[in-house]
Amino acid sequence: MAKWILLIVALLVLGHVPSGSTEFKRCWNGQGACRTYCTRQEKFIHLCPDASLCCLSYSLKASPHSRAGGV
């Protein structure tokens, strides 16, 4: 019986999901992500409001009109 209780407690502890969103903040009209560092498949566009980098995938074209739309 003690083994079952230990197993249940272990599963509950390991299965805990922290509250809040783990996704990066979005920028460049939702096409970019605010990060500390851009990945190799991304390029730096501009700074986000929290001074992190707005990283945009190389597969997406950054048009001048997108930037004026907001952060």
UniProtKB/Swiss-Prot annotation:
GO terms for cellular component: extracellular region. Pfam families: Defensin_beta_2. Residues 1-22 form the signal peptide. Keywords: Antibiotic, Antimicrobial, Defensin, Disulfide bond, Secreted, Signal. It is found in: Secreted. GO terms for biological process: defense response to bacterium; innate immune response. InterPro entries: Beta_defensin_dom. Disulfide bonds join C27-C54, C34-C48, C38-C55. Has antibacterial activity. Belongs to the beta-defensin family. This is Beta-defensin 25.
